[in-house]
Amino acid sequence: IIKSKSLSGGTICIGVSEIALRIFLLKKLEKFTELFPDVKIKLTNHSTNQAVNALKAGLVDFAVVTTPVNLTGDMKSESLCSFHDILIAGPKYSQPDNKIIHLEELQDYPFISMAEGTGTHDHYTKFFYDNNLHFNLDMEASTTDQVLAMVQANLGLGFYPEELASEYIMRGEIFPVNLY
């Protein structure tokens, strides 16, 4: 991968999903580049499934993605960190007095999530199915940043990583929705 694996030069190509990059990898890359300044880094932005396919095809050296992920052959996975999604709303759909809404009530609101074929979509499809509900979307996004932007524009409710949502909540741009 890198000059004789000595980390004295060369390039590392990493397939990374958006959330994995923002929650985990950026902090690690900062430290890595300080320790190994002569190693070039090439990041390719993918959904989890696309990153795994890029790895299978030899287009990247390794992948850092969110779960769920389906690996085949001799691929291995290692959990590096965890995060928690919360339900968020823009001002139009914020709940008065932190009202708790039931999962079934989400069908009464426009709902935004990642497009079919993404790990996030698969995760929430299973989550709703496990709760005897259908995962019905009003809007599909290609990235989690698009989910955030659509929620901020009062287009509906959406799940978003709590760690990334907190700064927008503190500024009053979005609001957490308590879900039962």
PLM regions and their residue ranges:
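Hydrophobic residues within well-ordered alpha-helices
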Residues: I14, L55-K56, L106, A149-L155
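Beta-alpha-beta core module
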Residues: T72-F83, D145-Y180
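Central regulatory/effector-binding core of bacterial HTH transcription factors
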Residues: G9-T72, A141
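Flexible hinge/capping segments at coil-to-helix
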Residues: D74-F111
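Secondary-structure junction motif
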Residues: Q95-P96, P110-N131
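Ligand-binding cleft/hinge of the Venus flytrap
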Residues: L29-L35, L59, E104, H121-H134
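Alpha-helical linker/hinge and terminal dimerization helices associated
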Residues: I1-K5
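Short, well-ordered beta-strand segments
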Residues: T11-G15, A63, I88, I112, ...
